[in-house]
Amino acid sequence: MNRLSYLFLPLTAIGVSACSSNKAKEEVKRPNIIFMMTDDHTTQAMSCYGGRLLQTPNMDRIANEGIRMDNCYAVNALSGPSRACILTGKFSHINGFTDNASTFDGNQQTFPKLLQSAGYQTSIIGKWHLITEPQGFDYWCILTGQHEQGDYYNPDFNENGKQIVEQGYATDIITDKAIEYLEHRDKSKPFCMMYHQKAPHRNWMPAPRHLGMFNNTVFPEPATLFDTYEGRGSAAREQDMSIEHTLTNDWDLKLLTREEMLKDTTNRLYQVYKRMPADVQNKWDSVYAQRIAEYRSGKLEGKELISWKYQQYMRDYLATIVAVDENIGRLLSYLEKIGELDNTIIIYTSDQGFFLGEHGWFDKRLSLIHISEPTRQAEIS
């Protein structure tokens, strides 16, 4: 991978294809770009940021061989708007995509269009979540369904305007498609690929191979898990993202048996459960049976119940990230295999961060607001 000295110059000179020397003009091989984005991944769940919850060796590799940004903030704490800001370089009120009910105006300038006009092959594979079809890409294969959030199991895609269904787990499939695209690209041109995972977006559904992997793990609780918000403004008390009150028993905690889901097939959890193959459904039932039994034992209440909910949330959220890290490793290995790793700028980010129990919360949407201390006035004599 490109080290620090190579990370910025190619982006400022992207249209330059040759340089001069006293002896001859030699062609400069322009760098490839892979922009990796996950959904709702937070630094607390990345070991390269000192997170103690999960080891992420492949993300760590990107950080160790490049640079790690320690002071970056999302312009908008919602999925679609954050993506629109990244594409356009504009604030939400200027690019027009202010919330997830908006529709993206693809006619405006975006960085993939600029790269495409400079001779790059451009592609986006995975989550798009901007309603309109992508523009400025030679190839796209984007998740559809669940209001364009996409599904974890047997997901639907829009592939260059054609609707398809793929069998398997979304995080793996998106990587399969990314590698397949790289195999068949025009190798005479540099490429820019936006590699966008759905994971670990709510409701945190791990890959079949990772179901239950943390069932016997007890994760450390944040010091503010039982925060009462005393002395704080009304927003802290009135938020709707608390582990105690907002986590749902069905969608988030998955506290429904197969029989209960079949009694009400309109249930949101059943809509994703029914997409699983029979063997995955059986494993799911087995893994979550213990959780359901614990919850229904009648022994959990008060702070003990909050702690229990926190552990279930962490087990699903972190297990979902494991597949993300594994697949980053697959993609890095493929680039190494074809000899393109050292000529590829790799950027990893998330559309925004996420609370992992801090202040008893599990979601996002907290504005970065800093109020400076008023300047002290000089005494008037």
State the predicted function of each range.
Residues 380-381:
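Hydrophobic alpha-helical segments, chiefly the membrane-spanning helices
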Residues 2-8, 12, 18-372, 376:
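Formylglycine-dependent sulfatase
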